[in-house]
Amino acid sequence: AMAFGIGYHPAFRIPMTEGHTDYELRFSQAESPVCIATNGEGLLTDHTYYLGKNITTIPVNRALFANDSHMMVGLHSKELSLVEKDTGRSVTCYISGYPYVLIWSAPGEPQVVCIDPWQSTPRPAEGGNRWEEKPAAAVLQPGETYETCLKTTFSGV
């Protein structure tokens, strides 16, 4: 058997065009994103929290990424977009089929926003370092195949 994890880490520069500062992440339907907390090393903890309740947007600002990233679990949306609010320009990642979606930017005023659809997770802070011990590791048996892709749409409006 072959154990593995896979995820994408696309990064999008903001501002998309000079003079624009108001951005948001937009779900394709209302969500109450549950996030798994990580420690300072990016490893999973036993804690969870809500990023919001029954929301369709998340403002992109310094406060959103003050404590690093947010790993959302079990979203129902098929798409998550980074939207320049005053022009409608956007980048849309199609996240359907990915059990985890991480959003990240370096601390400070966001200059790059990442929308990361993942099939697996980092390892737990308390636990082994073997792939087979990861809670979301995929395991392929001999003769099986696995295929994935990330569809992204850029809209200049």
Model-derived regions: residue spans:
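Short, structured beta-strand/loop micro-motifs enriched in basic residues and often containing a Trp
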Residues: 125-132
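Glycine-rich active-site loops that engage anionic ligands at enzyme catalytic sites
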Residues: 84-122
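Active-site/ligand-binding surface loops and adjacent short beta/alpha elements
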Residues: 11-14, 18-95
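Short coil/turn motifs at secondary-structure junctions
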Residues: 11-15, 120, 155-157
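Short Pro-Gly-centered flexible turn/kink motifs
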Residues: 138-156
